Amino acid sequence: MNTTPYLEIKEEVYQALKENRPIVALESTIISHGMPYPQNVEVAKNVEETIRERGAVPATIAIIDGKMKVGLSKEELEFMATSKNILKASRMDLPVILAKGFNAATTVAATMIIAELAGIKVFVTGGIGGVHRNAQETFDISADLQELAKTNVAVISAGPKAILDLQLTKEYLETFGVPVIGYQTDELPCFFSRESGINVPYRVETPKEIASIMKTKWDLGLQGGIFIANPIPKEYSLDFEEIDKTIENAIEEAKKRKIKGKELTPFLLSKINELTKGESLKANIELVYNNAQLGAEIAKEFNILS
């Protein structure tokens, strides 16, 4: 497999790989499609700093001029946050975007692929994609789920995005053999909310336990990732029933406007932020910081074991 012409690893990340230090991968869709400017670039920088403060090296992943970048400079972060010509890349898009020299933010799926190519095993995001509501009619299921089934990277998030069908997303992951693990919780968190009423199959209390599960899974040759659900801190959690009603209203609006596919999630997140008068964006920012802290601790523990 020849990835050299396509992969560009930032010096800080390259040195950490060489010296076998803990590294945490970060996606870029949250920067270009998930939050408005200037919050997006501020959050990206703060997340990287949070990871550094906890003794790991951040590696924000994006595609710039057809190169898979593992670790971004300040200028590149700013470019991803402000440019209007940033595509959204999942697994199916990578060959086209690289071959044509385009710029793209990486989804959970694409970030997992690039992280694994670079040798990074821990990845932090806000929320994963999953089975959309009414997927039995639309067949709208995120490629993130298949990636979790096939790519050896542990993903830390605040649960599936709240706009999804959480029960079906959990069922899908279980069908494809992806361990779904609640960090200090028995319930699958619902992104903006700690509660969902849906139980997780396994609960763990420490980053060390998670690192041990990762090592055991891959020692056994069991292909695929691990999904770690880390609830948003209590003080920032939104009421589950209220946010669910807001989401239903946003989905109705999307249907009226015939918004589908890749455009749907950014539209819904933006509409929900508008309807909650900015509360959902605040929650989104805090849950990402919380996930970054946990991700750094898991990366350090996994580093000791491996």
Swiss-Prot record:
One Pfam family linked to the record: Indigoidine_A
Enzyme class: lyase
Keywords recorded for this protein, A-Z: Glycosidase, Hydrolase, Lyase, Manganese, Metal-binding
Residue sites binding substrate per the record: 88, 108, 142-144
GO biological process, one term: nucleobase catabolic process
Binding site for Mn(2+): 140
This protein's name: Pseudouridine-5'-phosphate glycosidase
Gene name of the record: psuG
